[in-house]
């Protein structure tokens, strides 16, 4: 029986499940369970033979998954980089809904939001790894500049890094989201319309501390192994860095590749067929502003070996 009390509004929910072209008897991977919107809808379309295997690093997501009392469903407390543990060519579809979820943002104790004061944590998996506060305590100005510039696309990254260093020297390590937001606001003097000056820095630190882009690249590569011919890859991203990786990955595996050292050899056959992209409708954006930046890209696995 599929039930639950979640209030998180899953972005592009119906569009993503439609893009998977669900086979009722198929095995599907929900690579980022979150609060289970995609898994629940998938289960409603599967037969008794179908299965959903979910992945998530967040203990709150693992707890939410316990509300799904269904033998066809299982969840692993792992990041989706571990997709390659699944048997080769065993799944009919892989769905990745990237980034941070609304419940994570809205819970001050998780430290993801500059709008709600809380401990400066930002770890998806709070059982392991450094928090943002711990990393900022010892990070060099150069390292902070690189992270904020590369992962936040913040043109004032150097100013922000020096402001953080000055704050550390004068008042000790940063401990809360409010303290970091204030430091960033003091360094970033220009304002982007409708965007808090701390937005890019918070994004950068979250992506870095969770190794989000590296994990995405590994998961995409693993999807080639686990998808069966005709299986679908559906990825929903929320910022340009993620979307660029997904776009380039699909493009790289959707064309024939010739070996310049062997010009007369047959080309390497493409492993994916690109099926385009979709954005949230105006109606969805009006009801859920966080869906505005969402981009869904879809590809189909060919029969070529990974």
From Swiss-Prot:
Catalytic activity from the UniProt record:
cytidine(1402) in 16S rRNA + S-adenosyl-L-methionine = N(4)-methylcytidine(1402) in 16S rRNA + S-adenosyl-L-homocysteine + H(+)
Q: Which residues bind S-adenosyl-L-methionine?
A: 36-38, 56, 80, 97, 104
The UniProt entry, under Pfam families, shows: Methyltransf_5 (PF01795)
Superkingdom of the source species: Bacteria
Q: What is its main location?
A: cytoplasm
Q: Which GO terms describe its biological process?
A: rRNA base methylation
Keyword terms:
Cytoplasm, Methyltransferase, rRNA processing, S-adenosyl-L-methionine, Transferase
Q: Single GO cellular component annotation?
A: cytoplasm
Q: Where is this region: Disordered?
A: 280-306
Query: Where is this chain's protein located in or outside the cell?
Result: Cytoplasm
Q: Which residues form the signal peptide?
A: none
**Enzyme Commission code(s) on record:** 2.1.1.199
Report a single Gene Ontology molecular function. Answer: rRNA (cytosine-N4-)-methyltransferase activity
Query: Which family does this protein fall into?
Result: Belongs to the methyltransferase superfamily. RsmH family.
What is the documented function of this protein? Specifically methylates the N4 position of cytidine in position 1402 (C1402) of 16S rRNA.
Name recorded for this polypeptide: Ribosomal RNA small subunit methyltransferase H
Q: What is the lineage of its organism?
A: Bacteria, Pseudomonadati, Pseudomonadota, Betaproteobacteria, Burkholderiales
């Amino acid at each position: 029986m599929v039930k639950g009390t979640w209030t998180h509004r899953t972005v592009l929910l119906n569009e993503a499940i439609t893009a998977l072209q669900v086979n009722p008897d198929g095995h599907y991977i929900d690579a980022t369970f979150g609060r289970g919107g995609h898994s629940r809808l998938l289960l409603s379309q599967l037969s008794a033979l179908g299965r959903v295997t979910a992945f998530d690093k967040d203990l709150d997501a693992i707890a939410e998954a316990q509300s799904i009392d269904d033998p066809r469903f299982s969840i692993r407390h792992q990041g989706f980089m571990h997709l390659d543990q699944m048997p080769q060519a065993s799944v009919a579809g892989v769905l990745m809904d990237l980034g941070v979820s609304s419940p994570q943002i809205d819970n001050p104790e998780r430290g993801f939001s500059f709008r709600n004061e809380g401990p400066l944590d930002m770890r998806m998996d709070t059982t392991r790894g450094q928090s943002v506060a711990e990393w900022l305590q010892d990070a060099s100005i150069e390292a902070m500049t690189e992270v904020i510039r590369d992962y936040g696309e913040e043109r004032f990254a150097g100013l922000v890094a020096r402001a953080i260093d000055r704050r550390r020297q004068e008042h000790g390590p940063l401990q809360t989201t409010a303290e970091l937001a204030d430091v960033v606001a003091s360094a970033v003097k220009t304002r982007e319309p409708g965007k808090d000056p701390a937005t890019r820095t918070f994004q950068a630190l979250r992506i870095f501390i969770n190794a989000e882009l590296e994990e995405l690249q590994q998961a995409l590569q693993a999807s080639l192994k686990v998808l069966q011919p005709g299986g679908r890859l559906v990825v929903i991203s929320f910022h340009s860095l993620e979307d660029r990786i997904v776009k380039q990955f699909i493009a790289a595996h959707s064309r024939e590749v010739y070996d310049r050292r062997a010009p007369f050899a047959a080309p390497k056959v493409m492993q994916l067929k690109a099926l385009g992209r979709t954005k949230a409708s105006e109606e969805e954006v009006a009801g859920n502003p966080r869906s505005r930046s969402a981009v869904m890209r879809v590809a189909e696995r060919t029969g070529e070996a990974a």
